[in-house]
Amino acid sequence: RSFALYNEEDFLQLSGIQHYEFCRRQWALIHIEMQWQENVRTVEGKILHENAHNPGMKEKRGDLLIVRAMPVHSREMGVSGECDVVEFHKGKDGISLAGKEGLYTAVPVEYKRGKPKEDDPDILQLAAQAMCLEEMLCCTIPYGCLYYGEIRRRVKVEFDTAVREKVRKIFAEMHRY
């Protein structure tokens, strides 16, 4: 597949895909017109994310390396953003990490305030994070996890071809604005 690479000054905010898919008007107000109103729900969401977003914090638990607030980008999709958490699981296959022994597989984890939804804006955001990581780390990431604060549980999300194509299509649409 041939594609053009975006310049950094044309990058969109990765998190915008969630707003765009949920409500294009909301996305335009936040990301184009820079209008944002805090409310109880957004403040609760910010508090939940503060636990995940401790920039540069790395934590090792046995064969698990946890990186918080990891910056990611994709020149192919023209986006940049931050993963709440990326877990690197040590195993028999995967990628090598600088300064670490062995091979690791990456699993992005996105924190959400509420509970699982019927539609897929959260899934698209998580898939976009995985696709950025794949481009940056030259690997394949088959799944990630959404952690929902309201139910205090993770939901595993598989990244199939349909989800990946939808992410690419939506970012291409967003770039036209």
Indicate where each model-derived feature is located.
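Metal-dependent nuclease catalytic cores that hydrolyze phosphodiester bonds in DNA/RNA
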Residues: 1-108
